[in-house]
UniProtKB/Swiss-Prot annotation:
One of its GO terms (molecular function) is molecular adaptor activity. This is Interferon alpha-inducible protein 27-like protein 2. The chain crosses the membrane at residues 8-28, 51-71, 73-93. Disulfide bonds: none annotated. Keywords: Apoptosis, Membrane, Mitochondrion, Transmembrane, Transmembrane helix. Belongs to the IFI6/IFI27 family. Residues 93-133 are annotated as: Disordered.
């Protein structure tokens, strides 16, 4: 239970901290859009598509706002909650135990070939083959 709670706390913290880091790496910084970045290319494409300006409420405008001012408190709470849920899910997931290797140890009483049926190979319906010289 403590492992799951720790994973939830880590997941929430990572989710909240990752947003500004990722936006900064893409080019949406506190000082504006970084030159020659992916954000600059996105803004250029949005401006060309809209006839010279970036529309308010568009993806580029929203990301620029978040990059400059950060997320609101309610957005951080929501993001932290989602990150905590994923962290708890991943932290509480049980891994399947690996199966023993084919030549590895066997349970007591089980010998190789013990449970394998002994069947004769099928006989040819044409009878024995004759090779002529």
């Amino acid at each position: 239970m403590i492992k799951r709670a720790a994973a939830a706390a880590i997941g929430g913290a990572l989710a909240v901290a990752a947003v500004p880091a990722v936006l900064g790496a893409v080019g949406f910084t506190g000082a504006g859009i970084a030159a020659s970045s992916l954000a600059a290319k996105m803004m250029s494409a949005a401006a060309v598509a809209n006839g010279g300006g970036v529309a308010a409420g568009s993806l580029v405008a929203t990301l620029q706002s978040v990059g400059a001012a950060g997320l609101s408190t309610s957005s951080n709470i929501l993001l932290g909650s989602i990150g905590s849920a994923f962290g708890a899910l991943l932290g509480g997931a049980k891994r399947a135990s690996p199966s023993p290797p084919p030549g590895g140890p066997r349970p007591e009483g089980e010998q190789p070939g013990e449970n394998v049926p002994q069947v004769e190979p099928p006989k040819s319906p044409l009878g024995p083959e004759k090779h002529e010289k």
